[in-house]
């Protein structure tokens, strides 16, 4: 994340290198195709999948909380947030309303719902907890990270309160809701956020209870380095960040224990290029394949670095990203079946890391793999085959949006329309932006803000999963200058005004080239 330096409107405008404009134009092409395709998917595939009788979104034929609510619904929300706010605030938001009305079962903990027969499907306790935790971590957190303290935050808060109210597992440190390491890793990620968003002590107390439960094992190191087990790596990293931010007494203890975890994984669980295996030591069958969650795990390492104030693992991350240039990772078969989900997860992790450790070889790898296997950008936009709505395909849509916003540096054009292009690139002075449209367009160019602080209550932009990374952000109270590179005109705006949106008009086929500082 970069917050720009601001200069007065009267300052002498710096010269913009032609290469910066060329890079922004190329980013506009990449992001324009991606966002227009996502908008097609939203209207042609996803919104029609909402059941007209219940209002639920049975994206894969079911409404449950382990897959549909956790992995499909959040990226329906992201797609609407980026390309159609009316859809977000209409049928997409209504899914949130009806799932609470129909599915709440144990207080506000939901259960799956048979939308065809109109009845709840009540699982055993462990599955109930697992599904609700999945919904919070993969679903609601992802939405809250981009919408802030909206109704999705209220839902997240309610479920977490009741998950811990009904915790049944006795430990020497107090009751916890599960012995499942995946659930507990998810809980660490949720509780750390809720603590900083609310200031309520019970959330960090519960998170410490989980950390103490695992660190009570003298040599605790998670064995599974991919999903359904690796969640605790990033969860412990984020907890350390929050402990450090709030000068809590356990911060130093957790720092030492977590370094042992990280060093052991590097020593035993990585190949020579820094990519992680599915299992820390086992190499039989699928265990010997590379984990598509390698980037998720390194997010925890970078969070550790930022928390302790030393770049202990940054070089390891940089080297790993640079090694992606090697032929071995060209169209690597992450899931063993060339699933879109394997590519999408691996690339998502890489984007999180590139946001913190920019490495040219890593950006090139991401662009190439996205174009071929996830966005599939060689297909004509008007006739391109769209993604489905089941969870593996929805994860693809997630990463398409993340990749597109990397190329816009977090800028969003509202309303989006097919044929619009928007791209941006950093310069030493700020940002260069290129926009064009094949049809007349008028709307607002909306800039990102430091959501980590404004929404999440984080002192720093702690590296974390289940978010849209911050690229170029504006400080609400600061003054910025937008310069038209073709006319030379300069327009002052505050960060708040830029976040709400700068009014623009595009003539068909005529590019607007702008610089902001």
Model feature map: region roles:
Residues 4-516:
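Glycan-recognition and catalytic cores of secretory/periplasmic carbohydrate-active enzymes
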């Amino acid at each position: 994340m970069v917050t720009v330096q601001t200069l007065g409107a009267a300052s002498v405008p710096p010269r913009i290198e032609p290469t910066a404009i060329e890079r922004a134009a190329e980013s506009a092409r990449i992001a324009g195709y991606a966002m227009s395709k996502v908008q097609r998917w939203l209207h042609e595939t996803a919104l029609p999948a909402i059941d007209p009788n219940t209002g639920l979104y049975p994206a894969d034929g079911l409404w449950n909380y382990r897959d549909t609510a956790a992995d499909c619904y959040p990226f329906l929300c992201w797609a609407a947030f980026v390309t159609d706010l009316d859809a977000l605030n209409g049928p997409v938001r209504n899914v949130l309303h009806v799932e609470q009305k129909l599915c709440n079962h144990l207080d506000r903990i939901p259960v799956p719902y048979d939308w065809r027969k109109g009845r709840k499907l009540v699982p055993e306790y462990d599955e109930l907890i697992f599904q609700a935790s999945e919904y919070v971590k993969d679903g609601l957190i992802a939405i809250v990270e981009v919408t802030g303290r909206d109704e999705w935050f209220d839902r997240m808060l309610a479920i977490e309160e009741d998950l811990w109210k009904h915790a049944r597992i006795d430990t020497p440190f107090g009751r916890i809701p599960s012995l499942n390491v995946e659930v507990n890793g998810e809980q660490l990620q949720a509780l750390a956020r809720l603590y900083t968003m609310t200031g309520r002590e019970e959330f960090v107390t519960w998170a410490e209870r989980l950390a103490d439960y695992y660190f009570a094992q003298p040599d605790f190191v998670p064995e599974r380095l991919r999903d359904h087990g690796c969640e605790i790596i990033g969860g412990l990293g984020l907890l350390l960040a929050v402990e450090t931010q709030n000068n809590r007494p356990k911060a130093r203890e957790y720092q030492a224990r977590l370094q042992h975890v990280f060093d052991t994984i590097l020593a035993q669980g990585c190949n020579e290029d820094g990519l992680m295996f599915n299992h820390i030591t086992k190499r039989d069958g699928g265990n010997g394949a590379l984990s598509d969650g390698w980037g998720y795990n390194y997010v925890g390492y970078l969070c550790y670095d930022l928390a302790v104030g030393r770049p202990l693992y940054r070089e390891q991350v940089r080297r790993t990203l640079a090694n992606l240039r090697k032929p071995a990772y060209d169209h690597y078969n992450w899931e063993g079946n060339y699933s879109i989900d394997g590519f999408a997860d691996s690339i998502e992790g890489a984007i999180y890391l590139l946001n913190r450790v920019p490495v040219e070889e890593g950006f090139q790898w991401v662009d190439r793999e996205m174009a071929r296997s996830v966005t599939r950008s060689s297909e004509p936009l008007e006739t391109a085959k769209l993604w489905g709505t089941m969870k593996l395909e929805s994860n693809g849509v997630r990463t398409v949006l993340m990749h597109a916003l990397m190329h816009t540096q977090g800028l969003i054009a509202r309303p989006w329309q097919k044929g619009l292009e928007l791209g941006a690139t950093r310069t030493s002075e700020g940002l260069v932006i290129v926009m064009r449209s094949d049809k007349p367009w008028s709307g607002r160019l909306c800039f990102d803000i430091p959501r980590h602080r404004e929404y999440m209550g984080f002192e720093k932009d702690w590296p974390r999963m289940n978010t849209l990374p911050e690229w170029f952000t504006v400080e609400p109270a600061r003054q910025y200058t937008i310069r038209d590179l073709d006319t030379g005109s300069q327009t002052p705006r505050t960060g708040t005004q830029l976040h709400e949106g700068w009014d623009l008009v595009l003539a068909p086929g005529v590019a607007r080239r702008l610089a902001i500082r």
